[in-house]
Amino acid sequence: MTRVIHTGDTHVGYQQYHSPERRADFRRAFDAVVEDAIDEGVDAVVHAGDLFHDRRPELPDLMAVLSALRRLDDAGIPFLAVVGNHEATRTGEWLDLFEGTGLATRLSEAPVRIGDTAFYGLDWVPESRRDDLAYELEAPDADHAALVSHGLFT
């Protein structure tokens, strides 16, 4: 059985109430997810979007997440993710950068198999475009399948 930690809406970089302490809390919370994944020896960490609070995360936040993803990579734990509404842009997202470095995998309609589970992903889609959404998934070559999305779809 595939064991994962599923998380989302971590909003690294969010300075809630304009408080630097709250900003640090969001970073620590993401670090805790990573440490739990390593301590538990899970097969993957699955993130359902809004890793960052902003479309243009500040360098200290990018570096903190980069360090956390390196720790996962060093432990042999893949980081699978989709893009959320707080970080979606027309020209590219943080996930493209981390995928390019080999530290993350952007989930899509093509399955990513981890153990006995095929993972698929759907980035955030604005509500105005959801009725026209055509999304076809490849049949999984796995015992189980999971679709990770950011947003509510019916």
Identify the role of each PLM range.
Residues 57-154:
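His/Asp/Glu-rich metal-coordinating catalytic cores
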